[in-house]
Design a protein with these regions (language model features):
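N-terminal membrane-proximal hinge/A-helix region immediately C-terminal to the signal-anchor transmembrane segment
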Residues: 1-103, 117-121, 144-149, 346, ...
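Conserved cytochrome P450 K-helix E-x-x-R motif and the immediately C-terminal K′/meander segment
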Residues: 23-52, 243, 247, 316-356, ...
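Conserved cytochrome P450 K-helix/beta-meander segment immediately N-terminal to the heme-binding cysteine loop
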Residues: 83, 368-418
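Cytochrome P450 heme-thiolate monooxygenase catalytic core
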Residues: 88-99, 137-286, 302, 473
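C-terminal helix/juxtamembrane-tail motif
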Residues: 255, 475-495
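Short, small-residue alpha-helix embedded
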Residues: 281-293, 451
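Cytochrome P450 heme-binding "Cys pocket" and the immediately downstream C-terminal segment
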Residues: 299, 366, 428, 441-477
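Cytochrome P450 heme-thiolate "Cys pocket" and heme-binding signature region
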Residues: 394-448
Length: 495
């Protein structure tokens, strides 16, 4: 006989008759604001107690949400999922693919916002080309050209104080989109050019799409009742992206391989999905890593020392160069630990399941709050401290710190505690886990490594403003303008 407790007794905010818990988000006061879900998660974490779970039941148009605040529990759920794991739906995107533009997508709805057999069938066609390590490694030289062009553009958009413009996050969107075009479509989209007509249309679509997503996917679904202005902007952007993917298919890139076997439509649908999930996420990761390094002179100097040793200034980088940059990779991991681009991943469980000692019914949506776990002391000692060394292997640490560990006592203490604690494999999952993890993970990592290597090899980057705050859009992005200050390293003495 099961000793699990009844689901009814799982802690959580009490739903009201008829309207359930939806009223909390409808009113929109802390801690129940869709753009401040980080605050909501910390509130629920306090409710859960040590290693427990919390439910938010009876949300209008949504299944019950269950939040297990335990890396061990997260591991159990992930490891027992079936061959076709179900993620939370993106209702508006699903509507676009499966209803509004069904004549185009038909039986090939893609990977995003799709579940079950259609998702599994499409994934089987495209996964080999995306997951194979050699595919992303082969793309490094072309991505390096994009990174070089973007860093050159950064120099051009600096003001008289050598400060980047307030819309620098949009510039990072352009870089990310140009990068996806390079490796997925095998072409340059022109996003980094000032007067390219296609590029202007693309950027307009980027603005329209990313401003529409949080309103449509996180707020009350008014678009189901009538075509709101935001809904129209969203659909126009998706149509434009779809046309772009068909128009820009070439005989190069990952999608060209797919087209040879499965046809241009499958290749274009894959390209569309890659654009939808590979632009704002990668741009946000780049922004956060720049911010943490700009605020941490010690880590920035360590990174620059590694770059000076392993990457000649004018060299076109390849995958072997990236292999020699463990500290750069640790800097990115540490940034994504503190500020993951997605606060949590989810699964819609397909059978009754015991979670944190409670019987959870089939159909519930389990949300894995990685943002909370990766910022807790029990998994990461001194979690608010930016310490890339915690991700390094023992043999890499002494060189990265320029000296024996005892030289920097604070960092050494954090590293030793982390070594004793270990890093739980399910405490920080910025790319997800399992068959539904980010399918473009290797490409995104290469994009980030190349861009950040170029920036910090060339510049000292500083931040002269206060602490950045973040919002959920649904990507976790900074609110304030990213006005970094850049100085050429060869024109300014190193500290």
């Amino acid at each position: 006989m099961s000793s699990a407790r009844c689901y009814t007794y799982m802690p959580g905010p009490r739903p009201l008759p008829v309207i359930g818990n939806s009223w909390r988000f409808a009113i929109g006061k802390n801690p129940w604001r869709t753009r401040a879900l980080d605050v909501t998660l910390w509130f629920l974490r306090a409710w859960a107690g040590t290693g427990g779970a919390v439910k938010v039941a009876k949300l209008f148009g949504h299944p019950d949400l269950v939040f297990p605040f335990s890396a061990d529990e997260t591991a159990k759920i992930y490891r027992r999922e079936d061959a076709m794991p179900h993620r939370a739906k993106a209702p508006c995107l699903s509507h676009y693919k499966q209803e509004l533009r069904k004549n185009f997508f038909g039986e090939e709805p893609g990977l995003i916002g799709v579940h079950g057999v259609p998702w599994s069938r499409f994934r089987s066609k495209v996964s080999k080309a995306l997951i194979a390590p050699e595919a992303s490694r082969a793309a490094v030289p072309e991505l390096d050209y994009v990174a070089n062009d973007f860093v050159s553009r950064m120099e051009c958009i600096l003001d008289s104080n050598r400060e980047l413009p307030k819309d620098f996050l949009t510039e990072l969107y352009k870089w990310a989109l140009e990068s996806v075009g390079a490796w997925a479509l095998g072409t340059r989209l022109g996003c980094l050019k000032e007067n390219d007509a296609d590029a202007k249309d693309i950027i307009k679509c980027i603005h329209g799409f990313f401003h529409s997503v949080p309103i449509l996917e996180l707020s009350a679904p008014l678009w189901r009742l009538y075509s709101t202005p935001t809904y129209k902007t969203y659909i126009e952007a998706l149509d434009a992206f779809r046309t772009l993917c068909l128009k820009r298919l070439t005989d190069k890139g990952i999608c060209a391989e797919i087209a040879k076997t499965y046809g241009e439509k499958v290749a274009a649908i894959l390209a569309l999905d890659l654009l939808l999930v590979g632009v704002d996420t990668t741009a946000a990761a780049a922004a956060s890593t720049m911010y943490f390094l700009a605020n941490n002179d010690r880590a920035q100097r360590k990174l620059q020392k590694e770059l000076d040793k392993n990457v000649p200034q004018a060299k076109i980088m390849d995958c072997k160069d990236l292999d020699r940059l463990p500290y750069l990779k640790a800097c990115i991991k540490e940034s994504l630990r503190i500020k993951p681009v997605i606060l949590g991943n989810g699964r819609c469980i397909q059978s009754d399941t015991v979670i944190s000692g409670y019987d959870v019914p089939k159909g519930s949506h389990v949300v894995f709050p990685h943002y909370i776990l990766s910022n807790e002391e029990r998994y990461f000692p001194s979690p608010k401290e930016y310490v890339p060394e915690r991700w390094l292997r023992t043999q890499d640490v002494s060189e990265a710190m320029e000296c024996p560990l005892g030289h920097d006592r604070k960092i050494a203490d954090v590293w030793r505690k982390q070594k004793e604690t270990g890093i739980h494999p399910f405490a920080s999952l910025p790319f997800g886990f399992g068959r539904r993890m980010c399918i473009g993970k290797r490409f995104a990592e290469a994009e980030l490594q190349l861009l950040l290597a170029k920036i910090f090899h060339r510049y000292d980057v500083t931040w002269r403003y206060g602490e950045l705050t973040y919002s959920v859009t649904p990507t976790y992005v900074p609110n304030e303008p990213l006005r970094f200050t850049l100085h050429h390293r060869n024109k300014r003495s190193n500290k």
